[in-house]
Amino acid sequence: IFDNNSRGSIQKIKNFKKKIKFIKGDIRNKQSLNKALKNTDAVIHLAYVNGTKYFYSKPVLVLDIAIKGILNVIEGCIKNKIKELYLASSSEVYQTPNKIPTDENEPLKIPNIFNPRYSYGGGKILTELMGVHYGKKYFKKLIIFRPHNVYGPNMGSEHVIPQFINRFKSLKGKNFKIQGSGNEIRSFIYIKDFLSAFNLIL
């Protein structure tokens, strides 16, 4: 695992410490990443800034990690002759889809480039674009997957499910204000289900 722990902690996976090798580093640092990738057979690229409030407040950071991250990962794989790459994208690449449920044929789009909200989705689209075209030339296996709102233990309180729970608890019987009609739907996947699905593509 190569991570700078900006949002996480090695303590959250302490039960697996004997089964993994942890290297602290920033994906934007090409030298550190290249060193970490030595003697590696495959790369699973998950490094990103997550959390809607950061899309609005820190769009430059979101894009910086997105663009430098995917470029350094691809160049590091090429340099170290790594032929398998798995890229985590997101349902954010669809924004407001034309149909629900949404399949992989739905067009990818950024509705408004001036809205910082789309720094995340735009970065993910760029990640996919680079993955597809570099993949054709340099990789034997390249897989892009688009998880929707993974949740589970130790996720912290900054994500939508814990925020809903905390807000509901604070209301103490008062009405819960929502946007829309209340009939809107959103996909969520439990971490164990996500890992089971991910194991199928390895």
What are these regions (language model features)?
Residues 186-193:
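A conserved structural motif in NAD(P)-dependent oxidoreductases
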Residues 168:
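Terminal helix-turn-helix DNA-binding modules in bacterial transcription factors
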Residues 180-184:
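Catalytic Tyr-x(3-8)-Lys segment
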Residues 57-58, 154-158:
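Short, solvent-exposed loop/turn segments at secondary-structure boundaries
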Residues 1-150, 172, 192, 198-202:
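N-terminal Rossmann-like NAD(P)+-binding domain of SDR-like oxidoreductases, especially those catalyzing
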Residues 174-176:
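Flexible, nucleotide-binding loop/lid elements of kinase catalytic cores
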